């Protein structure tokens, strides 16, 4: 039973480490969903972001954020020499770094273990480390043992991800999150499988602390994705949405597990979309009979 005088008073705030965010949603850390301009916009307005790791100098980005005193400084890294070098430069220069996301397709890997152990030698408690992607409770437990503060959960469920078709490896989003949450008490970032705002509420109900969305943002008018005109009708506009493991992003034809697709451009902005998500989550909280996101954890939400 709901006791809210109006759904507008329901709180959609969530927190990671010491940082509070207005909604439990983060744009995918892909080039078509996030760039420096959008990252700054999100940081200024108390939304979470994770900067992508492609064609970017992480040291220079973190340095810029420190110089401009961003509210949150959040990067992605891989497991290569260039990533170790960037981290070393950041730590040696005593730059503030709030969030590090180790972003690899198969997070339950010895290379991830090595870089987590490296990070833990130098980081302070102010730096929060996210690692992924994984899809099993055992993998989550190992990542926590290796030093991760949060786990990015999801394999093969993204709209432009072809991992499940090319390799056979995947797991439904809700089941995946629920299995990990039941066995491993760690902050979970759900990644992949969100097609509408209601799926965000379902992911929270399954046990996620934060939900990553790609296509939901890539198609917006102010996304970093290029605008493409319909060749037969120039008034019809599209945005290019492509996965991190796509040939479009990798600039190579090997080990491709993603595709590029044109999606209709939405004439709305990031801030408009995030406000819509906030309102829909407030309604979900009202239906759950609670006052905040925690209420979604105590109910069963079906997929229909």
Name each region found by the language model.
Residues 1-2, 146, 168-190, 194-304:
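Alpha/beta catalytic cores of nucleotide-metabolism and tRNA/nucleoside-modifying enzymes
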Residues 1-187, 215-217:
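Active-site entrance/lid segments in N-terminal catalytic domains of soluble metabolic enzymes
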């Amino acid at each position: 039973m709901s006791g809210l005088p109006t759904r507008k008073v329901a709180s959609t705030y969530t927190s990671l480490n010491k940082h509070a965010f207005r909604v439990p949603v983060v744009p995918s850390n892909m080039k078509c969903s996030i760039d420096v301009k959008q990252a700054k916009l999100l940081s200024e307005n108390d939304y979470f972001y994770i900067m992508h790791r492609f064609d970017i100098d992480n040291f220079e980005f973190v340095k810029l954020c420190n110089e401009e005193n961003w509210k949150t400084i959040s990067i992605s890294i891989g497991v290569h020499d260039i990533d170790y070098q960037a981290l070393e430069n950041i730590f040696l220069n005593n730059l503030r770094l709030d969030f590090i996301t180790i972003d690899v397709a198969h997070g339950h890997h010895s290379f991830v273990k090595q870089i987590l152990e490296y990070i833990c030698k130098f980081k302070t408690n102010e730096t929060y480390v996210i690692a992924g992607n994984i899809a099993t409770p055992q993998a989550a437990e190992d990542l926590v043992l290796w030093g991760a503060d949060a786990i990015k959960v999801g394999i093969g469920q993204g709209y432009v991800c072809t991992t499940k078709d090319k390799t056979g490896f995947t797991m439904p989003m809700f089941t995946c999150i629920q299995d990990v949450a039941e066995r491993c008490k760690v902050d979970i970032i759900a990644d992949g499988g969100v097609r509408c705002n209601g799926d965000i509420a379902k992911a929270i109900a399954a046990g996620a602390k934060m939900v990553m969305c790609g296509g939901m943002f890539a198609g917006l008018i102010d996304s970093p994705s290029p605008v493409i005109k319909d060749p037969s009708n120039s008034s019809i506009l599209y945005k290019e949405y492509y996965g991190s493991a796509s040939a479009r992003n990798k600039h190579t034809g090997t080990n491709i597990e993603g595709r590029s697709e044109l999606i209709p451009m939405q004439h709305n902005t990031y801030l408009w979309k995030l406000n819509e998500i906030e309102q829909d989550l407030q309604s979900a909280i009202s239906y759950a009979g609670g006052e905040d996101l925690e209420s979604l954890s105590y109910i069963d939400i079906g997929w229909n």
